[in-house]
Design a protein with these regions (language model features):
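Loop/turn-to-beta-strand initiation segments
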Residues: 71-74, 127-134
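Catalytic-core regions built around general acid/base machinery
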Residues: 113-129
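Short amphipathic alpha-helical segments
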Residues: 14, 88-89, 146-147
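Conserved P-loop NTPase nucleotide-binding/switch module
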Residues: 77-107, 150-154
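NTP-binding/hydrolysis catalytic cores, primarily Walker-type P-loop NTPases
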Residues: 215-249
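A short acidic, glycine-rich active-site loop
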Residues: 99-116, 173-176
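Conserved P-loop
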Residues: 1-76, 81-86
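Phosphate-binding/switch region of NTP-binding enzymes
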Residues: 130-228
Length: 249
């Protein structure tokens, strides 16, 4: 049972009889495009209260009372990247001094809410015996080396810019703003990455379950050193199934 925040599952027209989808219908903003443009240019927060994060929270609370959710063995959230877009706008609106962009204090609220809501979601799934799948988009992340210096200086417009002097490590991280990007994967037992290989001129999707030097992927499933699989949990978890059956037998 998926909470579809990206609103792409149903539009794909896939015939998935074993999958139920609950779509988040709320837009990122309740303001008109003209109002939002003016507010963004003037560095002002949203005029009307965004509804997306509040609706998502209500949907999560409703899961144990929702028939199709309780009949499913797995709950899914697709995706955390779009979810934080809703949360960010809610924070800006609720801040009495809010502007069009997050302040350092707002980033603290963003981190705290993502930490707490993720932990609550995981606990809720465990309490009801459900597996949990959370998807997130990726972005390139630059991490300063141990001897890299950070210099903050103002540009011609008076805005503070950060300049890094030294080596930078290129990583692929969850596409989440702020510090939670580096913490998100630590909340989950397994962390997989989807990628595409070109085979005979055709795209073939693969699922990587082991680190590749840039992504902090991992699995506790016995995979005998195999790093890439078809994007099918039945293939990845064969070793886990065999081990479990052996222990029970």
């Amino acid at each position: 049972h998926f909470i579809d925040i990206d609103r792409k599952v149903l539009s794909c027209g896939l015939n998935l009889p074993d999958v139920t989808v609950w779509e988040l219908a709320e837009a990122l903003t309740e303001d008109s495009m003209a109002e939002r443009l003016r507010a963004l240019v003037d560095n002002k927060k949203p005029k009307s209260a965004p509804q997306g994060w509040s609706k998502y929270s209500a949907m999560v609370d409703e899961l144990p009372r929702r028939k199709e959710a309780m009949e499913a063995g797995t709950w899914g959230i697709d995706s955390y990247t779009r979810l934080q877009d809703h949360l960010k706008r809610q924070i800006l609106y609720l801040d009495a001094k809010g502007a069009s962009n997050l302040s350092p204090r707002n980033y603290g609220a963003l981190l705290g809410m993502l930490e707490e809501s993720t932990a609550q979601l995981i606990d809720l799934a465990k309490a009801h015996g459900k597996d949990l799948i959370v998807t997130v988009h990726e972005r390139v992340s630059e991490i300063p080396g141990p001897n890299t210096r950070v210099i903050n200086q103002r540009n011609a417009q008076g805005e503070v810019e950060r300049e890094f002097i030294g080596e930078m490590q290129i990583r692929i991280a969850p596409s989440i703003e702020g510090q939670f990007s580096g913490k998100m994967l630590s909340y989950f037992d397994e962390a997989y990455g989807l990628h595409v290989d070109m085979v005979d001129g055709k795209p073939v999707w693969r699922c990587r379950v082991m680190p590749d030097g840039r992504r902090d992927l991992r699995t506790a499933i016995p995979v005998n050193g195999v790093a890439d699989f078809p994007p099918d949990f039945r293939e990845i978890w064969k070793g886990h199934t065999t081990t479990t059956q052996t222990k029970k037998g």
